[in-house]
């Protein structure tokens, strides 16, 4: 979300309208509980959605109790409550009668459809545990892989609303094994798995799943703009400087998704250009906006910490020793905080170095980035190989010029990797 979106209620409404019914309600209530200036607007938005598109009178009543300050001149809609109570009872009885009749007649497809209708009813009412149990009973009446894929997606969606992300991944595993029969579900399945991994703090797995989501995906729970934010933050936290540059150069999906959020795109470019203070400052400026995303907010502190840690490791690569003062200037961070971060990184064995608290310096051992030294070694060996080849070719050319009919002293060169060691 951009700052303008949060200040302008019309923009906020447009943002919320991109989601499905329950996501609209849950996101609006999350904002209401975390932003006092937007509380009244978001509560009334959620109430409107509840009354128009659901039968969840329990949530409706509880919101009047929780947000009493937003309803000073409003009363509980008793007429709506009575109407919903009546129709809920009527609909539930009818759905159960139909299901029982189909089971007595052993009509398999009709049983499946009736069980789906019952599960959908529980979801509309907001009884997600009952909806989950009803959807689970549909499995035995599915007759093909496509039906199983659609069912698994519904189970994933309900599990997200409940907040059971381990179940999302379990149902996602089943969905991925049957998705070939319903290819249109591929992006939502990977998006839900990515969201579950993200909420569980497994950012690398989240990144891997999000990268398989098509850029034109639009779903009731997570939008392509959300994925752009999550994928960019995960990349900043998980990928080092070298990997990030490679992905931006070669990965079309990552480029397309990260382009959807200009602010985070600037953060990615800042990291590529080693402008770490710009990266961290930009993230901090957007922190308030991110804190109003119900899935991002709980991960924000950990993500920012990992991004800062990854940036610090990338920053230290060229150095053998460095004063805290220079790091503090380049990162716009207090020296004491720098020292604390360095000690944590070294204790976690992510950096092979030592901290001199008296001199306020950090000393980095070469082995802290062994892959870089392996790259340097390979480059040196390759350079030596080409040098030997060039020398022998030059020698052969000179030998040819100095002889008339004789064969060259060196007719061919056969340089191997072993020569580069000599």
UniProtKB/Swiss-Prot annotation:
Extract the SMART domains matched here. PINT
Give the residues annotated as coiled coil: none
Domain PCI span(s) in chain numbering: 202-369
Q: Does the keyword Nucleus apply?
A: yes
The UniProt entry lists the main location of this chain as cytoplasm
Q: Which PANTHER family match?
A: 26S PROTESOME SUBUNIT 6 (PTHR14145), COP9 SIGNALOSOME COMPLEX SUBUNIT 1 (PTHR14145:SF2)
> What family does this belong to?
Belongs to the CSN1 family.
Gene3D superfamilies for the chain:
1.25.40.570
Which cellular compartments is it found in?
Answer: Cytoplasm; Nucleus
Which controlled-vocabulary keywords does the entry list? Cytoplasm, Nucleus, Signalosome
The family database entries (SUPFAM superfamilies) matched by this protein are listed as: TPR-like, Winged helix' DNA-binding domain
Protein's job: Component of the COP9 signalosome (CSN) complex that acts as an regulator of the ubiquitin (Ubl) conjugation pathway by mediating the deneddylation of the cullin subunit of SCF-type E3 ubiquitin-protein ligase complexes. Required, indirectly, for activation of ribonucleotide reductase through the degradation of the protein spd1, thereby supplying deoxyribonucleotides for DNA replication and repair.
State the organism named in the record: Schizosaccharomyces pombe (strain 972 / ATCC 24843) (Fission yeast)
A GO cellular-component term linked to this record? cytosol
Superkingdom, natural source: Eukaryota
Give an example GO biological process: protein deneddylation
Query: Could you give the subunit structure recorded for this chain?
Result: Component of the COP9 signalosome (CSN) complex composed of at least csn1, csn2, csn4 and csn5 subunits.
This protein's name: COP9 signalosome complex subunit 1
């Amino acid at each position: 979300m951009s700052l303008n979106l949060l200040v302008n209620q019309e923009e906020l409404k447009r943002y919320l309208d991109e989601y499905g019914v329950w996501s609209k309600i849950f996101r609006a209530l999350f904002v209401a509980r975390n932003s006092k200036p937007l509380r009244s607007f978001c509560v009334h938005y959620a109430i409107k959605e509840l009354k128009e598109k659901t039968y969840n009178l329990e949530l409706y009543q509880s919101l009047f109790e929780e947000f009493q300050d937003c309803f000073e001149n409003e009363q509980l809609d008793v007429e709506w409550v009575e109407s919903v109570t009546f129709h809920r009872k009527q609909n539930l009885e009818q759905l159960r009668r139909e299901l029982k009749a189909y089971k007595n007649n052993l009509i398999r497809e009709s049983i499946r459809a009736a069980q789906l209708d019952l599960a959908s009813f529980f979801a509309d009412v907001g009884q997600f545990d009952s909806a989950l149990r009803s959807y689970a009973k549909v499995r035995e009446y599915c007759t093909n892989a496509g039906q199983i894929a659609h069912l698994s997606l519904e189970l994933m969606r309900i599990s997200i609303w409940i907040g059971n992300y381990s179940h999302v991944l379990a149902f996602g595993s089943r969905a991925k094994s049957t998705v070939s029969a319903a290819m249109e579900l591929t992006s939502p399945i990977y998006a839900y798995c990515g969201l579950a991994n993200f909420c569980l703090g497994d950012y690398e797995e989240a990144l891997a799943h999000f990268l398989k989501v098509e850029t034109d995906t639009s779903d009731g729970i997570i939008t392509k703009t959300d994925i752009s934010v999550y994928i960019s933050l995960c990349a900043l936290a998980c990928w080092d400087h070298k990997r990030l540059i490679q992905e931006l150069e070669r990965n079309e999906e990552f480029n397309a998704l990260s382009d959807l959020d200009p602010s985070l795109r600037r953060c990615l470019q800042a990291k590529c250009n080693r402008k770490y203070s710009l990266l961290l400052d930009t993230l901090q400026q957007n922190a308030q906006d991110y804190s109003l995303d119900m899935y991002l907010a709980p991960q924000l502190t950990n993500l920012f910490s990992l991004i800062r840690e990854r940036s610090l490791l990338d920053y230290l690569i060229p150095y053998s020793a460095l004063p805290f003062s220079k790091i503090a200037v380049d990162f716009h961070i207090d020296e004491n905080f720098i020292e604390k971060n360095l000690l944590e990184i070294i204790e976690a064995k992510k950096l092979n170095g030592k901290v001199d608290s008296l001199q306020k310096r950090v000393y980095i051992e070469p082995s802290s980035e062994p892959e870089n030294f392996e790259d340097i070694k390979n480059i040196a060996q390759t350079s030596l190989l080409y040098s030997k080849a060039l020398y022998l070719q030059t020698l052969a050319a000179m030998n040819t010029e100095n002889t008339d009919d004789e064969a060259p002293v060196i007719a061919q060169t056969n340089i191997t990797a072993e020569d580069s060691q000599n």
